[in-house]
Every structure is written in C-alpha cells, then in structure tokens.
Amino acid sequence: MVKTPITEAIAAADTQGRFLGNTELQSARGRYERAAASLEAARGLTSNAQRLIDGATQAVYQKFPYTTQTPGPQFAADSRGKSKCARDVGHYLRIITYSLVAGGTGPLDEYLIAGLAEINSTFDLSPSWYVEALKHIKANHGLSGQAANEANTYIDYAINALS
C-alpha cells in the first residue's frame, strides 16, 4: 500500500487502538480540500506529457551537449539513446502524477527514489540530467494557482532526491 499522510495517520491510530484525533481529522480535511487542485495538476501534466517530455529532453541536450555527442548506451547520440532519455523523463513525470493523485510522496518514494542511486550508478546515468529535465517541466508545465503549487511540491521533492 502506498503511504500517504492519511494512511499513515490511520495506521498510527489503529496500532494504538484508538479513533482518529482532531489533529488527524483536520489533516485529512486539508488533504481533501487540496485534492481537486492535485487532480487538476495531474490532469494537466498528463495532457501535456509529450510536450513536456520533448522540451525537457531538449533542455538536457542543451545544458549537457556531450549527451548527444558521446556514443554509448547511456547517452543520446543516436535515436535509441534519445528514446531512452525520453522514456526515463516520462517515467519521472508519470510517477509525479501518481503522487499527485495519491496525495503523498509514497509513489515517488516506492517507485522512483528507492534504488535510484543504484540504478544511476549501474547504468552510469547522471542525476543532473534528470534535475535539469524536472526544472524544465516545472518552469513550463502551464499550471497556475493551487494546481501549480501541488505539482511543484512533488517536482521539487524529486529534484531534492536527485540532488
């Protein structure tokens, strides 16, 4: 089960054999009030996913030109490498939308961050590439208001995990 602040509060109360307290209920209420904005953000990121992925990969290639000039399976010197880069950026974006829908960092923690260092070192991938891609997505997602705040929270969380 994916952890969210609500599921953690329920688990803690259940472990202690008690009902949810006022603080926990207020926290749940706050989450439900933000849920509409989170769903709007997930919908916006999803509907613009290909544009965001394409722009993010171009931002990586511009900041790190060696990624398109160096041959090898971890680089984007050919169409196969470019496809892998787009796939990886898409994976990050998809997991961010899952976190928005779940209302917590559980999907990011479980599906992305756990084992991230091992994956990057095994395949000789630079976290800075994905930081740049996520910064581009954050700056260009086209969301506004509370939906932008919700999306940026999870994008920043992923950036911090990579940094």
Curated annotation (Swiss-Prot):
<keyword id="KW-0602">Photosynthesis</keyword>
<keyword id="KW-0249">Electron transport</keyword>
<comment type="function">
    <text>Light-harvesting photosynthetic bile pigment-protein from the phycobiliprotein complex (phycobilisome, PBS). Phycocyanin is the major phycobiliprotein in the PBS rod.</text>
</comment>
<comment type="subunit">
    <text>Heterodimer of an alpha and a beta chain, which further assembles into trimers and the trimers into hexamers. Part of 2 PBS rod complexes, the conventional PBS rod and a photosystem I-specific CpcL-PBS rod.</text>
</comment>
<keyword id="KW-0157">Chromophore</keyword>
<feature type="binding site" description="covalent">
    <location>
        <position position="85"/>
    </location>
    <ligand>
        <name>(2R,3E)-phycocyanobilin</name>
    </ligand>
</feature>
<dbReference type="GO" id="GO:0031676">
    <property type="term" value="C:plasma membrane-derived thylakoid membrane"/>
</dbReference>
<dbReference type="InterPro" id="IPR038719">
    <property type="entry name" value="Phycobilisome_asu/bsu_sf"/>
</dbReference>
<dbReference type="GO" id="GO:0030089">
    <property type="term" value="C:phycobilisome"/>
</dbReference>
<dbReference type="GO" id="GO:0015979">
    <property type="term" value="P:photosynthesis"/>
</dbReference>
<comment type="similarity">
    <text>Belongs to the phycobiliprotein family.</text>
</comment>
<keyword id="KW-0813">Transport</keyword>
<dbReference type="InterPro" id="IPR009050">
    <property type="entry name" value="Globin-like_sf"/>
</dbReference>
<keyword id="KW-0472">Membrane</keyword>
<dbReference type="InterPro" id="IPR006246">
    <property type="entry name" value="Phycocyanin_a"/>
</dbReference>
<keyword id="KW-0089">Bile pigment</keyword>
<dbReference type="Pfam" id="PF00502">
    <property type="entry name" value="Phycobilisome"/>
</dbReference>
<keyword id="KW-0042">Antenna complex</keyword>
<keyword id="KW-0793">Thylakoid</keyword>
<dbReference type="InterPro" id="IPR012128">
    <property type="entry name" value="Phycobilisome_asu/bsu"/>
</dbReference>
<keyword id="KW-0605">Phycobilisome</keyword>
<protein>
    <recommendedName>
        <fullName>C-phycocyanin alpha subunit</fullName>
    </recommendedName>
</protein>
